[in-house]
């Protein structure tokens, strides 16, 4: 469909700021009904693009029937999910030369109390450089006392900013470093500056989309995009209505806006249903892990703090390939490792957190973050070489508290200070933390010992010495169901003293199977 777009069309040529023209738009058809006809005279349920839900009202392309509550085949579900993942990119493709504009709030609730503008700009710059072909050509920190107004800045600063942007023909777009822009604000700024303007939400969401690998992550990104589609809908439909007499689809009694809003609601419902199916599968996997009684350690931290590198160092898994960029990990993965006690644990790599991360993104990734709530221990990785390490810690803890995690899980959290090799002579000033360098391998044994003790305490496992008969099945059962640390054979008795780490439930089974 030609008209309604959730984002910038790929390859769209942006007008130069010096020419004072907005980006060209396609000519509108004479009425919304003709726009619908342009897609092949399909029914509203068949609209394509970011608003449509697929090729039909049923996942298999057929029509749904009243009272038809049979479960759809799995391959139909797969096809329907792929349809939901289709959509236009949120940001323009190709090389972009970005002007980074940071509003420096001087007072009021919008003023950050724990950070400085220069570090906020540095993080925003890192976000831009995460995108292929994007570079920051100008950075402007502009003070404001009115961040909630439509144009964000005062009259004098706004005029000065507009003059600089329009006078720089090398600028192709502006990244306004605010969490979200209202649709009227975006419209006014783009009209004033002559280039497209993006906020933090849009940039981060586009990075999420680029880095999502599994279907679950891609569906969660699609769900997070829904507020953006809604905010763009009114603007795009208003453009479609310009010069049009009727706003209603012929014979439907439904306006074009109402139609698109309904399609959005239907698409969101389908995404949530698909995520619910995947959530149930994830629940089954967790049950299997629980039956095998592997302790689970969720590794959390600020984005690019070195979580994946640390997991690779702890497990020795050569298949793990860390990347030095923001939000490199969006898909939760589990990796087995062995602690000094010979206990096998699963390290769960999670999505990195970010300050001013829009709440809707966290909500959309709730299925992924459920793994944190079901873990036995949380390992909080901090990049102590970063000048904003304390602010990053506060952001992570605030996000974890927002997940409604059990209090014992938060209280037992282990904190590790990573990248100490970048801070000469580093010595932690906080108690109960472990300094390491995941890249250099420093401090890993101390960290494993700390995790060993913490897992034993968190899971209620106990270290016991059990005497077993060598001729029986007891020893092989213990090797399968517990962690055998040491076996001291007593030949004259035909027995052995076995030192094990065993859970309460496994010990109960052992006593029941081998009484006496």
From Swiss-Prot:
Chain intervals with Low complexity compositional bias? 18-39
Q: What would you give as a GO molecular function for this chain, any one?
A: GTP binding
Key words, A-Z = GTP-binding, Magnesium, Metal-binding, Nucleotide-binding
Domain Hflx-type G intervals: 295-459
* Bias (Basic and acidic residues): 57-67
Any GO CC annotation of this UniProt entry:
mitochondrion
Where do Acidic residues bias regions lie? Answer: 68-82
Please indicate if the UniProt record lists Ligase as a keyword.
no
- What InterPro entries does its record include? G_HFLX_dom (IPR030394), GTP-bd (IPR006073), GTP-bd_M (IPR032305), GTPase_HflX (IPR016496), GTPase_HflX_N (IPR025121), GTPase_HflX_N_sf (IPR042108), P-loop_NTPase (IPR027417)
What PROSITE patterns does its record include? Answer: G_HFLX (PS51705)
Residues engaged in binding Mg(2+): 308, 329
Question: Domain of life, per the record?
Answer: Eukaryota
Instruction: Cite the binding residues for GTP.
Output: 301-308, 327-331, 349-352, 418-421, 437-439
In terms of SUPFAM superfamilies, this protein maps to: P-loop containing nucleoside triphosphate hydrolases
Which tissues carry this protein? Ubiquitously expressed.
UniProt-annotated stretches for the region Disordered: 18-82
**Cofactors required:** Mg(2+)
Q: Any miscellaneous information on file? A: The gene coding for this protein is located in the pseudoautosomal region 1 (PAR1) of X and Y chromosomes.
Similarity remark: Belongs to the TRAFAC class OBG-HflX-like GTPase superfamily. HflX GTPase family.
Name by which UniProt lists this protein? Putative GTP-binding protein 6
Source species, please? Answer: Homo sapiens (Human)
């Amino acid at each position: 469909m030609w008209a309604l777009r959730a984002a910038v069309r790929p390859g769209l040529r942006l007008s130069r700021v010096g020419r004072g023209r907005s980006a060209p738009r396609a000519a509108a058809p004479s009425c919304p009904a003709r726009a619908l006809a342009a897609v092949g005279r399909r029914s509203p349920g068949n609209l394509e693009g970011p608003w449509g839900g697929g090729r039909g009202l049923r996942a298999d392309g057929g029509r749904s029937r009243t009272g038809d509550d049979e479960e759809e085949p799995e391959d139909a579900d797969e096809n329907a999910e792929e349809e939901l993942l289709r959509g236009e990119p949120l940001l323009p493709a190709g090389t972009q030369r970005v002007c980074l504009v940071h509003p420096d709030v001087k007072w009021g609730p919008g003023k950050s109390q724990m950070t400085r503008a220069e570090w906020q700009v540095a993080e925003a710059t890192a976000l831009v450089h995460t995108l292929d072909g994007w570079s920051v050509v100008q950075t402007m920190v502009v003070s404001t006392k009115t961040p909630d107004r439509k144009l964000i800045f005062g009259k004098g600063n706004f005029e000065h900013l507009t003059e600089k942007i329009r006078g720089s023909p090398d600028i192709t777009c502006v990244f306004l470093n605010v969490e979200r822009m209202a649709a009227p604000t975006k419209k006014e700024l783009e009209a004033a500056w002559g280039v497209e303007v993006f906020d933090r939400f849009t940039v981060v969401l586009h990075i999420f989309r680029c880095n999502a690998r599994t279907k679950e992550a891609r569906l969660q990104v699609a769900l997070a995009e829904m507020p953006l589609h809604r905010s763009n809908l009114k603007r795009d439909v208003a453009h479609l209505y310009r010069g049009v007499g009727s706003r209603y689809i012929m014979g439907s009694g439904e306006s074009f806006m109402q139609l698109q809003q309904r399609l959005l609601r239907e698409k969101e419902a389908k995404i949530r249903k698909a995520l619910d199916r995947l959530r149930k599968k994830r629940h089954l996997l967790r049950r299997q892990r629980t039956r095998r009684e592997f302790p689970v350690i969720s590794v959390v931290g600020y984005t690019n703090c070195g979580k994946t590198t640390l997991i690779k160092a702890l497990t020795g898994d050569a298949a793990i390939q860390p990347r030095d960029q923001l939000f490199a990990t969006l898909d939760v993965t589990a990796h087995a490792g062995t602690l000094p006690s010979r206990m096998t644990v699963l390290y769960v790599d999670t999505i990195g957190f970010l300050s001013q991360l829009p709440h809707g993104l966290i909500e959309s990734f709730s299925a992924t973050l459920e793994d944190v709530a079901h873990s036995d221990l949380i390992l909080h990785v901090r990049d102590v070489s970063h000048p904003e390490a304390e602010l990053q810690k506060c952001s992570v803890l605030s996000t974890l508290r927002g997940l409604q995690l059990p209090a014992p899980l938060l209280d037992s959290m282990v904190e590790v200070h990573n990248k100490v090799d970048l801070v000469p002579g580093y010595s932690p000033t906080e108690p109960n933390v472990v300094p390491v360098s995941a890249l250099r391998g420093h401090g890993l044994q101390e960290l494993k010992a700390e995790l060993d003790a913490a897992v034993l305490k968190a899971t209620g496992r106990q270290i016991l010495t059990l005497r077993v008969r060598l001729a029986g099945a007891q020893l092989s059962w213990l090797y399968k169901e517990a962690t055998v640390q040491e076996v001291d054979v007593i030949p004259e008795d035909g027995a052995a003293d076995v030192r094990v780490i065993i859970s309460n439930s496994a010990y109960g089974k052992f006593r029941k199977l081998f009484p006496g």
